[in-house]
Amino acid sequence: MAIATINPATGQTVQTFIAHSQVEVNAKLDLAQETFQSFRHLPFAQRGQWLRKAADILEQRRDEWAALMTLEMGKSIPQAIAEVNKCALVCRFYADKAEEYLADEVVTTDASQSFIAYQPLGVILAVMPWNFPFWQVFRFAAPALMAGNVGLLKHASNVPQCALAIAEIFQTAGFPEGAFQTLLIGGKVASELMADDRIQAGTLTGSEPAGASFASAAAGQIKKTVLELGGSDPFIVLEDADLDQALKVAVPARMQNNGQSCIAAKRFIVQASVAEEFFQRLTKAFQALKVGDPSLSTTDIGPLATPDILADIVAQVEQTIAAGAHCRCGGQALDQPGNYYPPTLLTDVPPNAPTYRQEFFGPVALGFTVDNLEEAIALANDIPFGLGASAWTTNPENQQKLIRGIEAGAVFINGMTKSDPRIPFGGIKRSGFGRELGRMGILEFVNAKTVWIA
């Protein structure tokens, strides 16, 4: 099977790779299993030294890695550079914190001595998406490796050069070859690998169907999985909100990564008394964004990653408008080479629209008007997803009602939903289960062993 790198800005094939054969995959699995037997016993200081070196390599060759991301999936250069910086940050964070997070935890019981010992699981299969091709991998790999596990990466098929580059970074930093390897294989093969006895656990970031298939394969073998799937995050604006600040944040909250982010704000739920002003100003802000060549530092919105993603967005917008939604800006693909779609705002979306509860994975925002806080919370929860949420209000009582009432893995008050190495990240409902980042993120990849000495 051939795996091609296609530039989404031009549609031109850049490079083609041959997928790994079954023999090659087996060899990588054997090497991973063999490496784990010694890697798990290395001191935290050694693994931390290598991880800090990986951070150095990320920063020293930042422009190279950023250009690679832009070439393969269309992310704008400034955002790609920011992604590389964030990867270096998460490496240093876990290099510093892993030993503290995984220290034996003393528990007072009737025993003369009792504690929890945290030990690595083994070989972990990571299936990762194209939208944040470096960040999604490093936020898994940094804690997993520091805990003493070894990783196998199956990356999205449209970012093979990013996948190979990440393995190169870890090996150049000093990690044994078998500690982190890249598999160039199809998604179906990745799910089938969960049945292999050499793999102890798996993690997947991607679509809901991909997550369901992966979890099903893991369940048949009773193997642990961490899933971070889709999201359709609400961005709630109440009448007492600081509109200037909310609007300033609303644009990157929706349009980061060309709108292709699971944790992006996708549904803007605004109280009626300020709704028209908010939507008019948001429309102008969207129209001011520059759509174009992602390799230029002046570009705000680059192309969507693939023609299929563009086709999905075109169909969703057409269906939403046909159902009665008001298109305030955008609404049609650009007539030029590449997978370009302009920033689009659709308001007055009726509940009977076939796209009402769908995730829009592109530069499209939906706008809703509500009368009060209770309606805002109900509308925010009226979807099958529960990844993140943003809410804007200066009233402390309303803030607490929003925090407790919204069904999501994270709620940001007067701020933009984001993933930060210091705090756990993950969702509920069909957005997945398990947590990444923070202490909870590293605990996903260890066995919490109870020790009781009578």
UniProtKB/Swiss-Prot annotation:
Name the pathway it acts in: Amino-acid degradation; 4-aminobutanoate degradation
Instruction: Mention one GO biological process in which this protein takes part, according to its record.
Output: gamma-aminobutyric acid catabolic process
Q: What is its EC number?
A: 1.2.1.79
Catalysed reactions listed for this entry = succinate semialdehyde + NADP(+) + H2O = succinate + NADPH + 2 H(+)
Q: Which InterPro entries match?
A: Ald_DH/histidinol_DH, Ald_DH_C, Ald_DH_N, Aldehyde_DH_dom, ALDH_GabD1-like, GABD/Sad-like
Q: Name one GO molecular function term.
A: succinate-semialdehyde dehydrogenase (NAD+) activity
Quote the record's binding site residues for NADP(+): W130, N131, K154, H155, A156, S157, G206, S207, L229, E359
Q: Which family does it belong to?
A: Belongs to the aldehyde dehydrogenase family.
Question: Any idea what job this protein has?
Answer: Catalyzes the NADP(+) dependent oxidation of succinate semialdehyde to succinate.
Q: What is the protein name given in its UniProt record?
A: Probable succinate-semialdehyde dehydrogenase [NADP(+)]
Species: Synechocystis sp. (strain ATCC 27184 / PCC 6803 / Kazusa)
The gene that this protein is the product of is gabD
